[in-house]
């Protein structure tokens, strides 16, 4: 039997994506100014980034990056366990651990890498199992597959389903893993109930709070703190640095013994160059602002309320989200692509989310809000969405990139 040719395979897959009108296109951003971004020579108001607190261009954050780069250079030059672990890395780990009320923290290059590291280091036996919400982020699901343990999934937010899956896999060590805030729906996991399930089934409870930390809870400490939980109930938690904190990278906080085990055994940690010290210095400045500036979260809450009230007034189907992620269901791919194009024509950049990222028939506009948005910009967006809906409803639809 002839060996499959990889070039022929990818050519066939490309043709299939073209036929399904699911080709993905990168849009090039020329410049950014707050929530405004220049694309193809036009300035658009963006409602599509994860810069929830507006920290990515904050003066103190940028100045910290510039100062550290002038002092330490552009990169860490080695992995953490060789000579890449700088004072800046240690300081940031301690700051985030203190902020979230955890004894220990460990920096990673990205949330995807961190999720792989956690599962690869902890679920190393064939009988081990990771039970997950069906709508968890791809990095959590892929991490289980790459770690080699068993993957069991339960219906979205279904606590009893999580219990059934754990009971059905009594052999081996177990982890119950969930997003804190779900990135495509914007809703929040029932963490208190899930923590009880994990305890009853002797499973380690792991929360990926990429979209919660900085936004929810006291001092922006995230979903876990907002639910009144801590390290006793959630022994490991993921924090990404590229969402509300406006930078890049990730941190796993947790029990000291667990974090030490990750540092000593997790291959994605051991065999990766450490984050640039300048980037880490910028994130440290962002963390301190996020802890201090409650006004950013207060403004976000006001903007979220204004958007939901306006969208509801005009008959849009909202999802159960009180977070900066505000999806508007459009149904078919052709509809959401036409809506997104109409909004761009009106001067707004809003992400069109379609299968396979979301289920068939659940395509949506993913509106994301920032503390830097103004009430006037939110109102203008709502009016533009209404106009886009009216235009799209009167024309034949065809999905496009």
Curated annotation (Swiss-Prot):
Database matches in InterPro entries: Aminotransferase_I/II_large, AON_synthase_class-II, AONS_Archaea/Proteobacteria, AONS_Proteobacteria, PyrdxlP-dep_Trfase, PyrdxlP-dep_Trfase_major, PyrdxlP-dep_Trfase_small
Cysteines paired by S-S bonds: none
Pathway given in the UniProt record: Cofactor biosynthesis; biotin biosynthesis
Enzyme Commission number, as recorded: 2.3.1.47
Domain of life where this protein originates: Bacteria
A biological process from GO: biotin biosynthetic process
Residues holding pyridoxal 5'-phosphate: 111-112, 183, 211, 240
MF terms in GO: 8-amino-7-oxononanoate synthase activity; pyridoxal phosphate binding
Enzyme class: transferase
Residues where substrate binds: 24, 137, 357
Location of N6-(pyridoxal phosphate)lysine modifications: 243
Cofactor(s) this protein cannot do without: pyridoxal 5'-phosphate
Keyword Transferase: yes
Gene3D superfamilies (alphabetical): Aspartate Aminotransferase, domain 1 (3.90.1150.10), Type I PLP-dependent aspartate aminotransferase-like (Major domain) (3.40.640.10)
Reaction(s) this enzyme catalyzes, per UniProt: 6-carboxyhexanoyl-[ACP] + L-alanine + H(+) = (8S)-8-amino-7-oxononanoate + holo-[ACP] + CO2
Record keywords, A-Z: Biotin biosynthesis, Pyridoxal phosphate, Transferase
Subunit structure and binding partners: Homodimer.
Family per similarity comment: Belongs to the class-II pyridoxal-phosphate-dependent aminotransferase family. BioF subfamily.
Reported function: Catalyzes the decarboxylative condensation of pimeloyl-[acyl-carrier protein] and L-alanine to produce 8-amino-7-oxononanoate (AON), [acyl-carrier protein], and carbon dioxide.
Protein name: 8-amino-7-oxononanoate synthase
Gene name tied to this protein: bioF
């Amino acid at each position: 039997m002839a060996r499959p040719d990889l070039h022929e395979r990818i050519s066939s897959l490309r043709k299939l994506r073209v036929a399904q009108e699911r080709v993905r296109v990168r849009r090039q951003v020329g410049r950014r100014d707050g929530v405004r971004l220049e694309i193809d020579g036009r300035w658009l108001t963006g409602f599509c980034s994860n810069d929830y607190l507006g920290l990515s261009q904050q003066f103190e954050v940028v100045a910290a990056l510039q100062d550290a780069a002038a002092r330490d250079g552009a990169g860490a030059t080695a992995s953490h366990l060789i000579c890449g672990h700088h004072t800046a890395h240690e300081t940031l780990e301690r700051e985030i651990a203190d902020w979230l009320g955890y004894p220990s923290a460990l920096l990673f290059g990205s949330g995807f890498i961190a999720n792989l590291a956690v599962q690869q280091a902890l679920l190393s036996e064939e009988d081990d199992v990771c039970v997950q919400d069906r709508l968890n982020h791809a990095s959590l699901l892929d991490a289980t597959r790459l770690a080699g343990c068993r993957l069991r999934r339960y219906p979205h937010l279904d606590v009893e389903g999580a219990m059934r899956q754990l009971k059905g896999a009594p052999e081996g060590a177990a982890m119950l893993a969930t997003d804190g805030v779900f990135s495509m729906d914007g809703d929040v996991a029932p963490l208190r109930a899930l923590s009880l399930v994990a305890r009853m089934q002797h499973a380690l409870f792991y929360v990926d709070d990429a979209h919660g930390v900085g936004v929810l809870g006291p001092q922006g400490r995230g979903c876990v703190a907002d639910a009144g939980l801590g390290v006793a109930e959630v022994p490991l938690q993921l924090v990404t640095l590229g969402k509300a904190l406006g930078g890049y990278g990730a941190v796993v906080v947790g029990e000291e013994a667990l974090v030490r085990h990750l540092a000593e055994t997790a291959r994605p940690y051991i065999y990766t160059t450490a984050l640039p010290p300048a980037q880490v210095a910028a994130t440290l400045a962002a963390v301190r602002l996020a802890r201090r500036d409650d006004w950013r979260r207060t403004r976000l809450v006001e903007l979220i309320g204004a958007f939901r009230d306006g969208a509801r007034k005009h008959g849009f189907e909202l999802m159960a989200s009180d977070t900066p992620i505000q999806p508007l269901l459009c149904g078919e791919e052709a509809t959401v692509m036409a809506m997104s194009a109409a909004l761009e024509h009106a001067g707004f950049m809003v992400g069109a989310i379609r299968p396979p990222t979301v289920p068939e028939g659940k395509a949506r506009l993913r509106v994301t809000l920032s503390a830097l948005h103004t009430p006037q910009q939110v109102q203008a967006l709502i009016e533009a969405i209404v106009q886009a809906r009216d235009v799209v409803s009167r024309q034949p639809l065809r999905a496009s990139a």
